[in-house]
């Protein structure tokens, strides 16, 4: 899979197709791709003989931009990776920077970050499962969960001021403290989600037509999933028990009780089952945290890295100087390198940072889970039906913004 795959490449490779074979484009602008993705597929009747995936349509040079932006400015780039669950990207980046700076944040910050992380995970899974149903002709199922997704969006919008590009968190804390009704609204969302998930489960995962279109389709073995670099729900659906929250715990994930759902054959059905159960487990995590959010500060005492409150800037010379230094000179991260992995909705999201002690990183690399899934698409669909390739793509949940970065 390369950026250099041009029309000439495909013309040369497929100029002598066997009789009866046809070359078709699935994308880059097609309802089934859910983003700017292109798959060039060779078919014999309805059977897929070969497939090639093309990336780069949404490439925005984020890693290179990371060398020019300050550590806080790079948050706007993380917003535009997996834009379905933006706060998970923001938190992953901030945790990587805080590790390099050896910053300890108040427990209140960690609790809020974890609650928002799990709400974002639920939002992402709702999109994946709902759109999978739409692609297979079950439009009504999506509507049962999208109402609750909207309720989560409203919480995030109240907290951050935005729905998609949240730029949630800052180095050392949150952008702002939670609003007074935050805990109450989170509880109401969780209460409403529980029966909605079970209803959705009955509508789709107990439907004979849905089962016929997903069971045994687009499967991958545990060995091949590991070889391709799978992580997250797609890896666990193949039978591999690996979750960064459990195996390399961060924040307070080692203090909460939750189960890691595991599938068997890595098929579309098992990827759906894993995501369905993960939503239940996310609710379980949230309910353990929401009643115990500690009082106190919502950011660490970091005058050299965290912007002071506006009223202090206007009335205190020292605070004004800190404000000027952070804005004009940026946050200086000690020299060194660090890789921080978090469990995003699609899998292991990692940020590798090399610092030379300046306001901007010397090098940034993003380990985005979608990149590895997309490489496997040809193997997953080869020999299957063209219609099944749509279900396979949906179940992988490839987000173009994260794929190309």
From Swiss-Prot:
| Alphabetical keyword list | Cell inner membrane, Cell membrane, Membrane, NAD, Quinone, Translocase, Transport, Ubiquinone
Per UniProt, subcellular location reads as: Cell inner membrane
The record's EC number reads 7.1.1.-
Query: How does the record classify its membrane topology?
Result: Peripheral membrane protein
Q: Which GO terms describe its cellular component?
A: plasma membrane
Pfam families per the UniProt record, alphabetical: Complex1_49kDa (PF00346)
Which Gene Ontology molecular-function terms are recorded? Answer: NAD binding; NADH:ubiquinone reductase (non-electrogenic) activity; quinone binding
Using the UniProt record, name the top-level EC class of this enzyme in a single word. translocase
Which catalytic reaction applies to this protein?
a quinone + NADH + 5 H(+)(in) = a quinol + NAD(+) + 4 H(+)(out)
Keyword Hydrolase assigned? no
What InterPro entries has UniProt attached to this entry? NADH_Q_OxRdtase_suD, NDH1_su_D/H, NiFe-Hase_large
Family to which the UniProt record says this protein belongs: Belongs to the complex I 49 kDa subunit family.
Subunit arrangement? Answer: NDH-1 is composed of 14 different subunits. Subunits NuoB, C, D, E, F, and G constitute the peripheral sector of the complex.
Describe the task this protein carries out.
Answer: NDH-1 shuttles electrons from NADH, via FMN and iron-sulfur (Fe-S) centers, to quinones in the respiratory chain. The immediate electron acceptor for the enzyme in this species is believed to be ubiquinone. Couples the redox reaction to proton translocation (for every two electrons transferred, four hydrogen ions are translocated across the cytoplasmic membrane), and thus conserves the redox energy in a proton gradient.
The record, for NCBIfam families, names: PRK06075.1 (NF004739)
In Swiss-Prot or TrEMBL terms, this protein is called: NADH-quinone oxidoreductase subunit D
Taxonomic lineage from the root? Bacteria, Pseudomonadati, Spirochaetota, Spirochaetia, Leptospirales
């Amino acid at each position: 899979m390369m950026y250099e795959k041009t029309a000439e490449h495909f013309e040369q490779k497929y100029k002598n197709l066997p009789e009866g074979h046809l070359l078709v484009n699935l994308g880059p602008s097609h309802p089934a791709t859910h983003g700017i993705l292109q798959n060039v597929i060779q078919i014999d009747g309805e059977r897929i003989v070969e497939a090639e995936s093309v990336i780069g349509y949404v490439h925005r040079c984020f890693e290179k931009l990371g060398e020019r932006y300050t550590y806080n400015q790079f948050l706007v780039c993380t917003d535009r990776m997996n834009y379905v669950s933006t706060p998970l990207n923001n938190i992953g980046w901030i945790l990587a920077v805080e590790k390099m700076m050896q910053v300890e944040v108040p427990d209140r910050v960690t609790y809020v970050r974890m609650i928002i992380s799990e709400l974002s995970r639920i939002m992402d899974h709702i999109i994946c499962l709902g759109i999978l149903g739409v692609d297979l002709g079950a439009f009504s199922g999506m509507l049962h969960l999208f109402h609750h997704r909207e309720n989560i969006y409203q919480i995030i919008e109240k907290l951050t001021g935005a729905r998609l590009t949240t730029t949630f968190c800052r180095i050392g804390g949150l952008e702002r403290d939670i609003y007074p009704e935050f805990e109450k609204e989170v509880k109401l969302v969780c209460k409403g989600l529980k029966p909605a998930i079970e209803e959705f489960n009955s509508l789709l995962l107990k439907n004979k037509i849905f089962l016929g279109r997903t069971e045994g389709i687009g499967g991958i073995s545990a060995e091949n999933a590991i070889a391709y670099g799978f992580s997250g729900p797609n890896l666990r659906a193949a039978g591999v028990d690996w979750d960064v929250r459990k195996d390399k715990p961060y924040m307070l994930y080692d203090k909460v009780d939750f189960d890691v759902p595991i599938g068997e054959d890595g098929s579309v059905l098992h990827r759906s089952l894993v995501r369905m159960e993960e939503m239940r487990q996310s609710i379980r995590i949230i309910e353990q945290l929401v009643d115990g959010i500690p009082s106190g500060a919502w950011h660490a005492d970091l005058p050299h890295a965290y912007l002071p409150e506006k009223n202090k800037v206007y009335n205190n010379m020292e605070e004004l100087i800190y404000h000027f230094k952070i804005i004009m000179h940026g946050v200086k991260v000690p020299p060194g390198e660090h890789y921080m992995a978090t469990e995003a909705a699609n899998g292991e999201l990692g940020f590798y940072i090399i610092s030379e002690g300046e306001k901007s990183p010397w090098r940034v690399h993003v380990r985005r889970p979608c990149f590895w899934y997309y490489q496997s698409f040809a193997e997953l669909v080869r020999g299957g039906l063209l219609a099944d390739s749509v279900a396979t793509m949906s179940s992988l949940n490839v987000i173009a913004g994260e794929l190309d970065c």
